[in-house]
Design a protein with these regions (language model features):
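Cleavable N-terminal export/targeting peptides
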Residues: 1-27
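Hydrophobic alpha-helix-in-membranes signature
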Residues: 8, 19, 32, 61, ...
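Short glycine/proline- and aromatic-enriched beta-strand/turn motifs that initiate or cap beta-hairpins
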Residues: 21-77, 177-185
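Flexible, solvent-exposed loop segments that connect beta-strands
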Residues: 34-48, 67-86, 109-128, 155-174
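Predominantly the C-terminal beta-signal and adjacent terminal strand-loop region
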Residues: 73, 132, 138-186
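Surface-exposed, polar helix/loop patches in the mature regions of secreted/periplasmic/lumenal proteins
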Residues: 92-138, 142-143
Length: 186
């Protein structure tokens, strides 16, 4: 028993020495959208996507929170429009060695507006949206990682109306987003 008690500190020291230390107490994530692909059949291809997703996670819990806001713009001969996505998410950082994996889900709203070529303003009803995303990151430095992400946004179809409240079209703002980002630990 005495041999065991005297060798216990040595064994614990060796075990702790081989386990990588996580020095970060808090990490901040920032992602930018690279592309957006609508899931609606026959939908126009977006001209641009802008915005960001920012998130915070604590070392104590593998959970984090994120907020994202994207603006997707479409231009055609007959109409210019944009959809604005605002989604709050919760994500979990998976304990995988060497790479950083995060899986998340969220909910929010999509608002749409547009203008016909003759100057008529269009508005779409607000659409409830859900979001699921995954990011895969690689640590470059001990407290810094770069990652790529894929996100699926499901939203309800909504009516697009003109200023006279006449339904002109139906819009499905659902789609997929590719993102790139960084994570900094503190």
């Amino acid at each position: 028993m005495i041999k065991f008690l005297t060798s216990l500190p040595l064994m614990l020291t060796l075990m702790l020495w081989t386990i990588p230390a996580k020095a970060e107490l808090l990490s901040v994530h920032a992602d930018v959208p690279l592309s957006f692909s609508p899931t609606q059949e026959g939908a126009d291809t977006p001209d641009s996507i802008s915005g960001a997703r920012v998130g915070l996670s604590l070392f104590i819990l593998p959970l984090g929170i994120a907020y994202e806001s994207y603006e997707v713009s479409y231009t055609s001969d007959s109409v210019d429009s944009k959809d604005t996505y605002q989604i709050a998410s919760v994500f979990v950082n998976l304990p995988v060695p060497v790479i950083n994996i995060a899986l998340g889900a969220g909910a929010g709203m999509v608002t749409g507006e547009g203008e016909l070529s003759n100057g008529t303003k269009l508005t779409a009803d607000d659409s409830a949206a859900t979001s699921f995303f995954a990011t895969l990151g690689y640590p470059i430095l001990p407290l810094f990682d770069v990652h790529a992400g894929y996100q699926v946004i499901n939203a309800n179809k909504v009516d697009v109306k003109d200023s006279s409240n006449v339904v002109r079209d139906e819009n499905d703002p659902s789609g997929t987003v590719w993102t790139a980002g960084i994570k900094l630990g503190f």
